Amino acid sequence: MEDYVKIEKIGEGTYGVVYKGRHKSTGQVVAMKKIRLESEEEGVPSTAVREVSLLQELKHPNVVRLLDVLMQESRLYLIFEFLSMDLKKYLDSIPSGQYMDPMLVKSYLYQILEGIYFCHRRRVLHRDLKPQNLLIDNKGVIKLADFGLSRAFGVPVRVYTHEVVTLWYRAPEVLLGSPRYSTPVDVWSTGTIFAELATKKPLFHGDSEIDQLFRIFRTLGTPNNDVWPDVESLPDYKSTFPKWKGGSLSSMVKNLDKNGLDLLAKMLIYNPPKRISAREAMTHPYFDDLDKSTLPAACINGV
């Protein structure tokens, strides 16, 4: 830690306080995340240190770079590249009655998918994607923060400040208690973020797990074994759930064209193996008119 100096506290993340800092000798500005773990007394579990150290290998223009993992008095500090704005703050800053430029929505979504596909290829899930951990710069680049941290530290029910972790972007298989889930959970979250990019409003803003599920069901229909094999045997599925018909997605997301709505619907398919993958989503006709050569990952994709 002696290599870094804290400049100011910039926020409270899922796992602890986040500071803006500077590397003393290079002057590089960084984000310093102090990780608070439930089992504080025993110090940091070695498995968490191992897991998180692997994340230093994730090097992609749309993934916030983990620069260093440091221990100080049984506290873990993660040193990340610094970006000053997150997507939630940006969406909140757009004046009432105005919306994000449709081409920027498209560019941001494509870049998010680039970052997700890169991590999924490396068997790393996010599990907690939301506008607060999508960071942007002033050049139109968006980057995913906190990729892989859920595996190292778990996804807490409450932030260490006792604020409840948001459920708005959580996939239905997670909400229904599925013990096994995989990469489609991140695609679902990205779909809900896609809708929010277009409308500035969260698509499903539940205030409890059951309210969250019911908001999804009202919009997309209550799932059963016909549309999602074995959903009725998931731990938190109840045969007493109201049977909504759904079919109201397009009326809730007015600012998307036909291709955008088609892609969104494919990202929000209930049955996880049938849900579009990040890689498949990137080839969807919605992106046909996006100039991919200007995107930050173009150089590594050979566009």
Swiss-Prot record:
Catalytically driven reaction(s): L-seryl-[protein] + ATP = O-phospho-L-seryl-[protein] + ADP + H(+); L-threonyl-[protein] + ATP = O-phospho-L-threonyl-[protein] + ADP + H(+); [DNA-directed RNA polymerase] + ATP = phospho-[DNA-directed RNA polymerase] + ADP + H(+)
Major enzyme class: transferase
UniProt-listed Enzyme Commission number(s): 2.7.11.22, 2.7.11.23
Pfam families, per the entry: Pkinase
UniProt source species: Oryzias curvinotus
Name this protein carries in UniProt: Cyclin-dependent kinase 1
Active site feature: 128
GO cellular component annotations of the record: centrosome; cytoplasm; nucleus
Keyword tags: ATP-binding, Cell cycle, Cell division, Cytoplasm, Cytoskeleton, Kinase, Mitosis, Nucleotide-binding, Nucleus, Phosphoprotein, Serine/threonine-protein kinase, Transferase
Phosphothreonine PTM positions: 14, 161
Family membership noted in the UniProt record: Belongs to the protein kinase superfamily. CMGC Ser/Thr protein kinase family. CDC2/CDKX subfamily.
Binding annotation for ATP: 10-18, 33
Role this protein plays: Plays a key role in the control of the eukaryotic cell cycle by modulating the centrosome cycle as well as mitotic onset; promotes G2-M transition via association with multiple interphase cyclins. During G2 and early mitosis, CDC25A/B/C-mediated dephosphorylation activates CDK1/cyclin complexes which phosphorylate several substrates that trigger at least centrosome separation, Golgi dynamics, nuclear envelope breakdown and chromosome condensation.
SUPFAM superfamilies attached to this UniProt entry: Protein kinase-like (PK-like)
Nucleotide-binding listed as a keyword: yes
